[in-house]
From Swiss-Prot:
Subunit field text: The Tol-Pal system is composed of five core proteins: the inner membrane proteins TolA, TolQ and TolR, the periplasmic protein TolB and the outer membrane protein Pal. They form a network linking the inner and outer membranes and the peptidoglycan layer.
Organism, as annotated: Rhodospirillum rubrum (strain ATCC 11170 / ATH 1.1.1 / DSM 467 / LMG 4362 / NCIMB 8255 / S1)
Functional description taken from the UniProt entry: Part of the Tol-Pal system, which plays a role in outer membrane invagination during cell division and is important for maintaining outer membrane integrity.
GO BP term, pick one: protein import
Keywords on record: Cell cycle, Cell division, Periplasm, Signal
One Gene Ontology CC term in the entry: periplasmic space
Protein name, per record: Tol-Pal system protein TolB
Compartments reported by the entry: Periplasm
Annotated signal sequence range: 1-31
Assigned protein family: Belongs to the TolB family.
Superkingdom field: Bacteria
Keyword Signal: yes
Annotated segments matching region Disordered: 423-443
Keyword Ribonucleoprotein: no
């Protein structure tokens, strides 16, 4: 098995170093080590992750660092409880040592991750791991990665994704990034920059300098481009930003107000809402021809469009029924149907990558809520609430949402929560932060 991975971000804007990670499958026997994540997990699986052993100072340090990131990813998912290394009975310095499963059962571990880091003659490092079912003594999955030393964090996220998938049966979401709006300064003179980070808050950097306010960044399906809205001299402009090259391209300089540009699933179009004639409608722009087509035609305000993952339908927010509600229509603008009928006002609908749910923001009784419902409007579930919670964005596996929360003092922070409503956690950022957008799994 071979996987080609790219995307080690440098501190300089737009520079990216290609990373080749060669993956070898270690022989395995499938064991029945399973977490059912569809119902919500209240009792995380106890998992032991001893330090990956190395043969010199560099590889030993990397082994410790890799285990730290893998542990944080898995623990942060809410599905796993990483056991305290002080309780470990057996040492596993490398893969040649056979686990004594009775020792791991004695500390109540259900899963065991064993690994090593080996320097190669060409300066690269081989990082290998095995996931064991402690009760059966069977190997669940094993992989080996060949990589440069400065790409250890990327490899760590990939390992965590492999473990997550092996136990849950679904794709992980750790080898991803988040773009967001970094906010500084007083509320009367707010500076809003485009920023990017790994999903765990590492590798933070700014993409714009703050000279003009930025809003609503969104990733392309390849995770290589971002579309966002910027106000320059009070004129809204929609840009495309290439993360790999650092090149910024003006997509359009639109009269009136423009809101929430977002890519189509095939990456060939951008959908947005524009107020061209004093009325806000939804438009779609073909990135190949730069031609726009109008999708809605109604005297109400239509905004916040989001494609279904197959591109055949669009969900959006409209007040055509009197109050703000969520609607679904075909990709050509036909067949408009209202799907939200609960109390309160609904906003910012966004379709899950799985296609099974639409997340939303809801305002009711002076409180804000983040929730999700099925595309037909059934099964509405509130996941969290607060003074102001807004801007949900999906992890690529459709199992976790990220959003921003503002307290009564105006401080904004990023948070994530499981789609079942468990495991809300704050994501650390160097400044206040809002309007997150989650990338697909990195190529």
């Amino acid at each position: 098995m071979t996987r080609l991975a790219k995307g080690k971000w440098r501190s300089t804007l737009g520079a990216m170093m290609a990373l080749a990670v060669m993956v070898a499958a270690i022989p395995q026997a499938r064991a029945e080590l399973v977490i059912d994540i569809t119902r919500g997990v209240r009792e995380p699986m106890p998992i032991a992750i001893p330090v990956f052993g190395g043969t010199d100072a560099q590889s030993s340090a990397m082994g410790r660092d890799v285990v730290g990131v893998v542990s944080n990813d898995l623990q942060g998912s809410g599905l796993f409880r990483v056991l305290d290394p002080a309780a470990y009975i057996q040492s596993l310095p490398n893969l040649a040592v056979q686990p004594q499963f009775a020792d791991w059962r004695a500390i109540n571990a259900q899963a065991l991750v064993q690994g090593e880091v080996q320097p190669q003659g060409d300066g690269r490092l081989r990082v290998a791991f095995r996931l064991w079912d402690v009760f059966s003594g069977q190997q669940v999955v094993g992989r080996a990665f060949l990589t440069q030393g400065d790409n250890w964090r990327r490899v760590s996220h990939i390992i965590a994704d492999e473990i997550y998938k092996a136990i849950t049966g679904e794709e992980g979401y750790f080898d991803t990034r988040v773009v967001y709006v970094a906010e500084t300064g007083p509320k009367t003179n707010r500076v809003k920059k485009l920023a990017i980070m790994d999903q765990d808050g590492a590798n933070q950097r700014n993409l714009t300098n703050g000279e003009s306010m930025v809003l609503t960044p969104r990733f392309s399906p390849t995770a290589q481009e971002i579309t966002y809205l910027s106000y320059y001299n009070s004129v809204p402009r929609v840009y495309l930003f290439n993360i790999e090259t650092g090149r910024r391209e003006l997509l359009g300089d639109f009269p009136g107000m423009t809101f929430a540009p977002r890519f189509s699933p095939d990456g060939n179009k951008v959908i947005m809402s524009m107020a061209l004639d004093g009325n806000t409608e939804i438009y779609e722009m073909d990135l190949r021809t730069r031609r726009s087509s109008r999708l809605t035609n109604h005297p109400s305000i239509d905004t916040s469009p989001s494609y279904a993952p197959d591109g055949r339908q669009i969900t959006f927010n409209s007040d055509r029924g009197g109050a703000q509600q969520i609607y679904v229509m075909n990709a050509d603008g036909s067949g408009v149907q209202r799907i939200s009928f609960g109390d309160g006002r609904y906003a910012t609908p966004v379709w899950s990558p799985r296609g099974d749910l639409i997340a939303f923001t809801k305002l009711k009784g002076g409180r804000f809520f983040i929730g999700a419902m099925r595309p037909d409007g059934s099964g509405e579930k509130i996941l969290t609430e607060g003074f102001l919670v807004e801007g949900p964005t999906w992890a690529p596996n459709g199992r976790v949402l990220m959003f921003f929360r503002q307290d009564p003092n105006g401080r904004t922070t990023l948070h994530s929560i499981d789609v079942t409503g468990y495991n809300e956690r704050q994501i650390s950022t160097p400044t206040e932060a809002s309007d997150p957008a989650w990338s697909p799994l990195l190529p």
